Each structure stands twice: as structure tokens, then as C-alpha cells.
Amino acid sequence: MNSKKHLGHTARKRFGQNFLHDTSVIQGIVAAIYPQPNQFLVEIGPGLGALTEPVGELVDHLTVVELDRDLAERLRHHPFLHQKLTVIETDAMQFDFGALYTKENLAEKGQKLRVFGNLPYNISTPLMFHLFKYHDVIQDMHFMLQKEVVKRLCAAPNSKAYGRLTIMAQYFCQVMPVLEVPPSAFKPAPKVDSAVVRLIPHKELPHPVKDLYWLNRVCSQAFNQRRKTLRNALSTLFSPENLTALGIDLNARAENLAIADYARLANWLADNPPADINKDEILDSEE
């Protein structure tokens, strides 16, 4: 028996496909999303419809973004939801959610996008970074993720889970864990535990920065060398005198600073950019 085959479809490794089938977990996720008939919901990676069907039954219309050609075609011909579904066959990492918001005239309707999905674990972090760009047109997001990723999203300073992903997520959103999900809830079963997280974009950013590049830069540099003191880890960006003037303990490490501290450092760099920094380079990170 092919353990990767579910409802006639074989999971494709390159798309990171693991299909949810546990009814109680599905009910818990739908309850957390709490979809209402007139809301504009967007599902990323609907797969075989484990969440699409129960959510679709509760709303007037549902937009789904699916990269897998075969699955997209199945959804277009869904036996009882096809008239409610708009299937966008594309890579969510490349999709312009802002253009969708504009096309659907949601501003005139006083609405924003509600985004949810069982995200492919191999792209979940970069996909969330992509979605954060559209924080001002998104009402909330509910995602199934690797449990360790949810821990990082929800982490507090002075913990091992606290990192660049924590800071960037909490910069844009209020983050709350919803429920934990065992591997047995999927087919094929992943090798890791999963969890559902709720992200609600801030109506007003609590710690706005002048240029997101510098927030990304200082977080990447600090957490890539998280065992070093900030005096050493950030030495190419700040002098010890600069850090002290900004209220940073020279002996602190990356996980000791709050988001407000990183925002303060980023804003100083925006006003005092090092001459030898190329802003077009790709930032590496431990996340």
C-alpha cells in the first residue's frame, strides 16, 4: 500500500505535501478560523480539500491558491463547492495578495483578507515573510506549521526559540498558538509534530522602523552569531560607543534584546548607514 497516496492523489515531495485527514483536528482548525458567510477568505495550499470543504460550506465564496496543477483541476470540478471556489493556480510565494485585495474592492466593503492554510513546511518561513508585506490588507492568518516554527513565532526574549523569525513576526502581528497536531493527523505522516498558529496584523505597528532592510539586517547579523556578545556580533554595524548610547548592554546577546531594542538599532542604521553595506545582498539567517 502506498502510504503517500490519499484520496487518489500521491503526495509530491517537491511541494512538501502532507494531507490532513483527522476530523477532530480539522474541526478544531475551522472553529479557530470561525469563518463567516460574507467574509473574504483565502486558503493557501488547499490540497485535497480537508479545510476547503468545511470552510467552503460556511462562506459565500472562497479563493484558493494552489501550485499543484492536478489538485487545482480537482478543485475546479469539486462536486459541491466548484461554484463557490475561485482557484488561482500559482505559487503563493509569488502571488500579489495586495492586488487581490484591490481587485475585490475590499476597502470599499470595509473588509480585509482572511488567510489560512496547511502550509508546506519546506517553504513556510519564507512564505510568511512574503505575507508580512501585505499586513495592512490582511485581517488575520491561521496556519498549520511545524511545531518548532510555532514555538519560534511565539517566543519571548531570553529563550532559545527567540530569533529573527520571532522578531519579524511579532513586529507585524500579534501571535498566538491555537492547537498542537500529531503526525498521525496527516497522510503521509510527517516526521515532526505540527501546530496551528493565529497571526493578527497590528492595526498600528508598535515599534515602526524607517527601513525594514535594517531591521532584517541587524537581526540576521545578531542571531547568526547568537553565542557572541552584541559588541562582537554587531561590530561591523555599530561601535561600542554607538551601542552604549542606544542603551544596549555590550555584554548582552541576541536573545536578550526586545523587539523595541532591535527597532531602535534599525532606525539608527537607517540614519547612519555603514558605507560598505550592499543593500541588494541576500540576508542569510539561522531561521
From Swiss-Prot:
Belongs to the class I-like SAM-binding methyltransferase superfamily. rRNA adenine N(6)-methyltransferase family. RsmA subfamily. Specifically dimethylates two adjacent adenosines (A1518 and A1519) in the loop of a conserved hairpin near the 3'-end of 16S rRNA in the 30S particle. May play a critical role in biogenesis of 30S subunits. InterPro entries: KsgA/Erm, rRNA_Ade_diMease-like_C, rRNA_Ade_Mease_Trfase_CS, rRNA_Ade_methylase_Trfase_N, rRNA_adenine_dimethylase, SAM-dependent_MTases_sf. Pfam families: RrnaAD. This is Ribosomal RNA small subunit methyltransferase A. GO terms for cellular component: cytosol. Disulfide bonds: none annotated. It comes from Haemophilus influenzae (strain PittEE). The keyword Cytoplasm applies.
